Amino acid sequence: MKYLIVVGLSLAGLTTVLAMPQAGSNARAQELIQTLKLTVLPKESGYLGIIGRSSQMVTMDGRALAVQSQNYYMLTRDLPINYLHWLAPDDTHILIEGGPVDYFIFHPDGRAEKVTLGMDLAAGQRPVVAVPGGCWKALRLRAGANYALMANTLSPEFTSDRVKIGAGAEWVKRYTNSAPWATPEELRKLIGPNFTAQ
């Protein structure tokens, strides 16, 4: 009798576990998209949800800007790449759930680096990646990961006139061999559909 009760409780517990969205599942990704009201980000790709901006202001080049703006950002298996773009503000990504994500950073001096946004610290991953303003960058969800939910802060705030999306042959030439992984083919993949003729 005790055996039957234990088995019954175990099966009930298993049913409960199976009914819950798993951390690596597409169901969990869809739940996050709906709950946080994320929408597809044009051109750059991925999912975006605007959280807000700071009430504190700064003046840069004679222009008043909020000290910071905050967003949710998400990559999924359907939209696994945040294509190459340049930002004037500092940009910091914090991994909330999922991942890992490879973060490609291209500095104004011609250096390139790849940092992995993730929770496996022993493997060299980091849960926070901070990118200085004036860099080019792209993010790609690692193979085997179903999604990555991040928060990002931009300082000063994001404005649409302080971003550039995509690049061309001259950019590819400049950053080719700037790191062992920076082949022309890999750089073109990071630019994706936003490759320009310039």
Where are these regions (language model features)?
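Positively charged n-region of N-terminal signal peptides that target proteins for export
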Residues: 1-4
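Bacterial N-terminal signal peptides
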Residues: 6-15
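Short, well-structured beta-strand segments enriched in hydrophobic/aromatic residues
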Residues: 149-151
